[in-house]
Amino acid sequence: DGEVNRIRGIAKKYQSLRIIPVAINALKGSVFTKNSKIKPTSWKDLRAFRIGLRKGAKYAEYGTTGMKVIAAATNKMVFRMLDRNRIDVAISTALEGSNTIRILGLKGISMVEQPLVTLELFHFLHVKHETLIARITISLEAMAREGRIQNIRNKASEERHSN
């Protein structure tokens, strides 16, 4: 039992999870918009806009606390709202947002070049598996040193782009 590709702070909310302290991936929290004049460089720059995000995208939920947010069940729903001008900006990872635009065949939506945030992602195990953390950490540290984690990420990215 556990979670994969989660931000470090998630254990504050889910206290039964324990982090494996080796980053296995990273996400770039990015802004997508139809208005080329919108170029936020921080979360607070979004305060004036109607913001769409996917429910459960914790980094986006935390970053937009107190703002005008519409949370949808899927990225497809978020980007359809943006396409129909129901929101001014969509928050998504660079990869997921770009893939959603491509899959839906949307035109006129672009990603702001500078991500709002780049976060390392980690494995988490349920507390009942806590005794495994030290061994898994050693294995992941070796994989990181040898470049194997990066190779796995590169291969996964290539496979996503070829589909």
State the predicted function of each range.
Residues 67-81, 111-114:
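Short beta-strand-to-loop elements that line the ligand-binding cleft
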Residues 1-45, 56-59, 113-116:
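Acidic, polar ligand-binding/catalytic clefts
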Residues 9, 58, 77-78, 96-97, ...:
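Alpha-helix capping/helix-boundary segments
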